[in-house]
Amino acid sequence: MIAALLLAAAAASAVDAERAFARDAQKIGMWSAFRKYADRDAVMFTPQAVWARDFLRDRKDPPKSISWRPAQSYVSCDARTAINTGPWFTPDGKLAGYFTTVWQRSGGSWHWVYDGGGPNKVAPAAGPPKVYRASCARRAPGAPIIPPPPLTKSQARTTPEDNGRGEAADGTLGWDWKVGKKGDRHFRVYQWNGSRYTLVLNNLVPAP
């Protein structure tokens, strides 16, 4: 266990962290792996937004885990925030859809803060993930994302709002999400290219 924790801490990139996460899902159990890599304030969807710490707290691992692999990774200039996406598969290896995970590095370790996904009929070709790094040219003013209304203390303790946002510390990568009343979800990622922000990921997840 100590060796596994040291390996997670030593992950050089969010792609490495994603791969370690996926390996651990097979080794120690799916929900155990989710708990291991989750940030304290990580968010999941069921389909409404829930705190991962509450959803995962007493959840037992299934007999067999799903599997997944990163296909694209969008990284901030300072390489401390990244958003990975790629296909995920049922325990018997059938394509089930795509995942999107937001990762942040703190204290030498990577933890995920957002985990979502949606249906997909075609998986990207297997191979090394494509990594897209934000520009480090010029100071990024902050991604063009509308912040959600502030939560009351009671709301913050119980459940996430139906929308949220986040941004890399250097401002070169930002994301936001919103859940509809029926459980549909919209997730966007903006990346700084040196002169402006471009929309690099736009997930429209239908209601279940």
Where do the protein language model's features map onto the residues?
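Second-shell loop/turn segments in exported
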Residues: 19-24, 41-45, 89
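Short, well-ordered alpha-helical segments enriched in acidic and aromatic residues
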Residues: 27-48, 52-55
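Short beta-strand edge/turn micro-motifs at domain boundaries
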Residues: 96-129, 185, 190-207
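Short, structured motif recognition centered on aromatic/hydrophobic residues
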Residues: 21, 68-70, 81-85, 98-103, ...
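Surface-exposed, charged secondary-structure patches
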Residues: 48, 56-96, 151-181, 201-208
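Short, low-complexity N-terminal intrinsically disordered segments enriched in polar/charged residues
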Residues: 2-31, 35-36, 121-159, 165-169
